[in-house]
Amino acid sequence: MNIKSLLLGSAAALVAASGAQAADAIVAPEPEAVEYVRVCDAYGAGYFYIPGTETCLRVHGYVRYDVKGGDDVYSGTDRNGWDKSARFALRVSTGSETELGTLKTFTELRFNYAANNSGVDGKYGNETSSGTVMEFAYIQLGGLRVGIDESEFHTFTGYLGDVINDDVISAGSYRTGKISYTFTGGNGFSAVIALEQGGDNDGGYTGTTNYHIDGYMPDVVGGLKYAGGWGSIAGVVAYDSVIEEWAAKVRGDVNITDQFSVWLQGAYSSAATPNQNYGQWGGDWAVWGGAKFIATEKATFNLQAAHDDWGKTAVTANVAYELVPGFTVAPEVSYTKFGGEWKNTVAEDNAWGGIVRFQRSF
C-alpha cells in the first residue's frame, strides 16, 4: 500500500462518515407564521381580536381634571378657594358571538384624587372618595345583564342632561349590583325588568346613607321605551324593598333639528323623603328639563333646569369645546336656590358655583 492509496481510502471513509452523520442530523422545524392582531369592527371602533380566539377586546377610558370655585351648589357652602380633583378611568370591553347571542363584558376601574382649597385629601362631589373603585363589572348575554352597573332607574330613561352638575336635585342612586333583562324590538320599542341590590353610598340628602337591601327581597325596576328619528319617550317604575315604597319617572326627548334637541322629565315618589334609594328628590315630585345645541363641529352648548316639591331650584349651563379630537374643555356655571323646606338644611339660600373640566378620552 502506497501513500496515494492511503489518502484515497481516508477520503472515502470521511465521506461515508459524513453521510451517516447527515442522516442522523435533527432538522429544524419551519418557523410558525406570526399572527398579527386583527381589527374587529363588529362592536364599534377600537376593538381587536385576542390572538388565537374569536373574542374582540377594546381598551379605552379617559383622564380628567376638574377645577371648582365659588359655592358648592349641592350643599350651599362657600368653598373659600379652589377645589381640584383628578381621575383616571380605565375601561375594558369584550365581545363575541355565541349560539345564545352576543356575549359581552364591561369593566371600569377609577383612580380618583381630590383636594380642597387647603390641599387636604377629601371627598369629591357625590362620587367616591379619593382612591380606587371598581365602578362597573358586568357580563351581558343577549339582553341579560348581571354584575355591578348603574340602576335601570337612571340608565333606561337616559340619565339627565349633558352638564357636570346634573344631579343637584337627585334622581336616584347610581351604582348597584343587579340582574336585568332588556327586550329590544325591531320597531323602536324596548322594555326592561331588573332586580337590584340598591344604591351604593349615594344618599341624596346626607351623601353618606347606604340603601342596600337588608334581606332576600331585591329592589325591582321595570320600564318601557319607544324611540324613533323624532326622539324618544320612556318611563320607569321602581319598588324600594327597604322602605317598601315606589317611585316613577317619565322622560321625553325631541330632536327639533339635527343640531338642536330638548328634553323634559317628571318624577313622583310615594314617600316624600330624599332618604331612599330611588325618589331622592325633595317631596313627592320633581321635574327636570334641558336643551342641547351643537353650534359647530367643536362646540356644544348644554342647559339644564330642575325643581322639586320642597322648593329647591337648580340651573346649570356649559359649553363643551373639543380643542382636538379626544380632548375637551368644558367651562360650566351653576346656580341653586334652596327654598321652602330646604332652607333649614343649608347656611345660604343661594349658591353660585363654577367648574372647568379638562378631559382626554381614548
From Swiss-Prot:
Physiological role: Forms passive diffusion pores that allow small molecular weight hydrophilic materials across the outer membrane.
Entry keyword annotation includes Phosphoprotein: no
The keyword Ion transport is annotated on this UniProt entry: yes
Protein name as it appears in the record: Porin Omp2b
Pfam families named in the record: Porin_2
Assembly behavior: Homotrimer.
GO biological process: monoatomic ion transport
Further details from the record: The pore formed by Omp2a is larger than the one formed by Omp2b. Omp2b pores have optimal permeability to allow growth and protection against harmful compounds. The larger pore formed by Omp2a may be advantageous for intracellular growth, when the bacterium is competing with the host cell for nutrients whose concentration is particularly low within the phagosome.
Record's signal peptide: 1-22
Entry's free-text remark on domains: Consists of 16-stranded beta-barrel sheets, with large surface-exposed loops, that form a transmembrane pore at the center of each barrel. The pore is partially ocluded by a peptide loop that folds into the pore lumen.
Topology with respect to the bilayer: Multi-pass membrane protein
Protein's gene: omp2b
Main location: membrane
Annotated GO CC locations: cell outer membrane; pore complex
Compartments, as annotated in UniProt: Cell outer membrane
Keywords on record: Cell outer membrane, Ion transport, Membrane, Porin, Signal, Transmembrane, Transmembrane beta strand, Transport
Chain segments annotated as coiled-coil in the UniProt record: none
Family as reported in the entry's similarity comment: Belongs to the alphaproteobacteria porin family.
SUPFAM superfamilies in UniProt: Porins
Gene Ontology terms for molecular function: porin activity
